[in-house]
């Protein structure tokens, strides 16, 4: 990808770092790469988000951060760049030339998810859908974290007024998950540490 914008570095330098966690991209200068030199910097997307109020404004600031990386290149007049590494992004945004507006949109929605400690589940959900989604849409589909799909199904029946009494102990809830829920588009993701995230269709 090519860029030509000239920017003042001071405002955006705090964004040129890799955070301990959260979304970030490594911007590489292709002119330097093709000349046999590695030149690039991490861009902290959350730090970029803090500078502006809108997603479109964030995409503009992100482009200006990229311009700073190129301005500092050992190759004079460098214009082309690519993303050579990422952190905390869904796979759908892991290409060399992601849409900057999509990076901005994901970061803003991820920040909303962080407020409810749903950031990891939100990222997995975007991967499953295959595109960046809103946190509001995520909340409509997300059914929480469970020890197993079977535990979720049993609770689902109980919460919806289906009192099975003693029959509950004879039901294979795992088979109910696969035979009824999974076949109807519900899905789960193993989050580690014995926890499953469950999503509706």
Task: For every predicted segment, state its role.
Residues 4-12, 150-201:
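Acidic, proline/glycine-rich low-complexity IDRs
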């Amino acid at each position: 990808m090519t860029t030509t914008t000239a920017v003042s570095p001071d405002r955006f330098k705090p964004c040129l770092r890799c955070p301990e966690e959260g979304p970030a991209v490594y911007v590489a200068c292709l002119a330097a790469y093709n000349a046999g030199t590695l030149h690039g910097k991490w861009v902290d997307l959350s730090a970029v988000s803090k500078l502006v109020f809108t997603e479109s404004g964030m995409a503009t600031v992100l482009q200006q951060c990229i311009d700073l990386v190129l301005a500092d290149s050992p190759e004079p007049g460098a214009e082309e760049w690519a993303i050579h590494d990422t952190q905390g992004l869904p796979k759908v945004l892991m290409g060399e030339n992601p849409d900057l507006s999509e990076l901005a949109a994901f970061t803003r929605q991820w920040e909303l998810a962080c407020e409810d400690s749903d950031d990891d589940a939100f990222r997995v959900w975007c991967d499953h859908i295959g595109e960046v989604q809103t946190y509001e849409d995520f909340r409509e589909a997300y059914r929480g974290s469970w020890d197993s799909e079977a535990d979720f199904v049993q609770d689902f029946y109980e919460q919806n007024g289906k009192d099975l009494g003693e029959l509950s102990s004879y039901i294979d809830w795992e088979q109910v998950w696969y035979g009824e829920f999974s076949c109807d588009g519900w899905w789960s993701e193993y989050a580690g540490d014995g926890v499953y995230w469950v999503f509706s269709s």
